[in-house]
Amino acid sequence: MLLAIGVIVWCWGLLSRRPMLRRQGKQKGRCCVLFSDLEVFLLRPPTPSASPPAFTPMNELNAEGNATSSATESHSLANGHYQPVTGEEALDTRGPDDWTHSVVDPPRTLDCCSSSEDCSKEKLDERLSLNSCTDSGVRTPLCRICFQGPEQGELLSPCRCSGSVRCTHEPCLIKWISERGSWSCELCYYKYQVIAISTKNPLQWQAISLTVIEKVQIAAAVLGSLFLIASISWLVWSSLSPSAKWQRQDLLFQICYAMYGFMDLVCIALIVHEGPSVFRIFNRWQAVNQQWKVLNYDKVKDNEDHQKTGATFRTLSLPLTHRMGQSGPEGEPSTSTSSLMAAAAAAAAGTVTPTTNSVPPAAGATTEPQDSSEPSNGQPSLPDHHCAYNILHLLSHLRQQEPRGQTSNSNRELVMRVTTV
């Protein structure tokens, strides 16, 4: 009995000693790892500061790491117990020669890649500069719409714009007009001089892109026009036809007449409101489905048109000026006329509330009216101030002219308020 109990206790002691040994071995291994890490951290050779560490190929690093790890594992197994090897220990096992050999020059592949990218950018810049500049160093004209040169087609200058926005290709301009729906330049507001050559074949007509609002505008204009035509035709027939005599006498039809008249007014207002938008859409469609010839900007013709419009304005304002200048029987301006002319001159100078005294002319002094078409002393002529001039002219006609006898006896003061627009 005692022998059996002793055997059991001895077996129990053996079984309990093995976990203790294992725990002691684990603790000992951890302490060794900690001390080895501290040794590597404190005693490892410093990295050279002359050149930055290079990126060695991954296959070489893996081979060296595997070799060092296998060597350390075999050494630990030879000592009788297994000790895990960390990466820092593997690095510590490498000698100083290995550290010096690991620091190599940077790979040339990165330099080649960066240099090739720089070369490609430089070549692209050179191509752009060659495309934009001629051999003489003068910048070649480019289309302001597609930014291409003369190799894409003939460049035109269709408006008053100058500089980099002067030239454009004819197809690009026609396409831009079809998108905007306007035949005028958006920068200088000059109307392009175009000639319609011919309309394309109906089989070649192209549809233009429309927004939802534009579709609604077209539908409203078309339906309003149809309703207006139908209602007006019915009203004309019912009011003039002898067979509709009984309709004109019926109260219900008279109410319908009033309703149709009101709806006709609404349709007319709708057509007037949506008409310009529909007209612009039609211009866009016409620009796409018709062949055009765009003309270059002619400065001489443009100046002639400006001169014609200026001459027309001056001819319209000349009779009014002569009426203001010649009011007396002997060509002498009256007091009201002279005061009005002085007020107009003050308004032209920027005076808001001019005050003039009508002084009678001295004996023997004569005044000659100046022609408004010729400016005096480099100042703009009187008809050019159209707003103030028209107001003063109306006031001069509304005011009664004074007799010549009364103007010599007393002086009257005329105060006028002129607002410049």
Swiss-Prot record:
It holds the Pfam family RINGv. SUPFAM superfamilies: RING/U-box. Residues 65-77, 367-380, 403-412 have a biased composition (Polar residues). Residues 1-16 form the signal peptide. E3 ubiquitin-protein ligase. E3 ubiquitin ligases accept ubiquitin from an E2 ubiquitin-conjugating enzyme in the form of a thioester and then directly transfer the ubiquitin to targeted substrates. It is an enzyme of class 2 (transferase). The keyword Zinc-finger applies. GO terms for biological process: protein ubiquitination. It comes from the Eukaryota. It catalyses: S-ubiquitinyl-[E2 ubiquitin-conjugating enzyme]-L-cysteine + [acceptor protein]-L-lysine = [E2 ubiquitin-conjugating enzyme]-L-cysteine + N(6)-ubiquitinyl-[acceptor protein]-L-lysine. Pathway: Protein modification; protein ubiquitination. GO terms for molecular function: ubiquitin-protein transferase activity; zinc ion binding. This is E3 ubiquitin-protein ligase MARCHF4. It is a multi-pass membrane protein. It is found in: Golgi apparatus membrane. A zinc finger (RING-CH-type) spans 135-195. Keywords: Golgi apparatus, Membrane, Metal-binding, Signal, Transferase, Transmembrane, Transmembrane helix, Ubl conjugation pathway, Zinc, Zinc-finger. The RING-CH-type zinc finger domain is required for E3 ligase activity. Its EC number is 2.3.2.27. Gene3D superfamilies: Zinc/RING finger domain, C3HC4 (zinc finger). GO terms for cellular component: Golgi membrane; Golgi stack; trans-Golgi network. The chain crosses the membrane at residues 218-238, 252-272. Residues 60-79, 319-385, 401-421 are annotated as: Disordered. Zn(2+) 1 binds at C143, C146, H169, C172. Zn(2+) 2 binds at C159, C161, C185, C188. The keyword Transferase applies.
